[in-house]
Regions:
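Intrinsically disordered, low-complexity regulatory regions
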Residues: 1-142
Length: 142
């Protein structure tokens, strides 16, 4: 599941942030990029549905990716306006925590077969995770 792949990435980031010793010479940046890509894949999957075998061309996949990034960027710009770019004062570890919280929400929604009580939709959670990962990378100087 894409949600589990995102969780693995976020959990590894959390471990890298907490542990001084690294046994694999890969940093947080690549994991944040992975979170962004898996979240976009999840948004595409929500739009098109789940399939057993790839059924879109590379060109169509790229168009869908760009479309979801553009929609997510617009959401980020609107939220930045409303929240006064509060993310700029946040630590990378706090952004990681927010990603993990969103993942818990997504898992709960998935476990309830898409039903939510008061929560936003699953797609909004993926969009927020993309934006938190981008904010973290900006903080890292990427």
């Amino acid at each position: 599941s894409l949600t589990d792949q995102i969780f693995i990435k976020a959990q590894r980031i959390r471990q890298l942030q907490e542990n001084a010793v690294r046994k694999v010479d890969e940093g947080e940046r690549g994991e944040f990029i992975g979170i962004i890509n898996y979240c976009v894949m999840a948004l595409i999957q929500i739009e098109l549905g789940v399939v057993e075998n790839p059924d879109v061309s590379t060109e169509e996949a790229t168009e869908l990716y760009d479309k979801h990034i553009a929609i997510t960027k617009e959401l980020m710009e609107n939220k930045n306006h409303d929240y006064g770019e509060a993310w700029r004062d946040m630590r990378i570890s706090s952004l990681t925590d927010l990603i993990l919280q969103k993942l818990l929400r997504v898992k709960t929604i998935e476990n309830n077969k898409g039903k939510t009580l008061v929560s936003e939709g699953i797609d909004a959670n993926y969009q927020d995770m993309i934006n938190y990962a981008i904010f973290a990378m900006i903080h890292m100087g990427s």
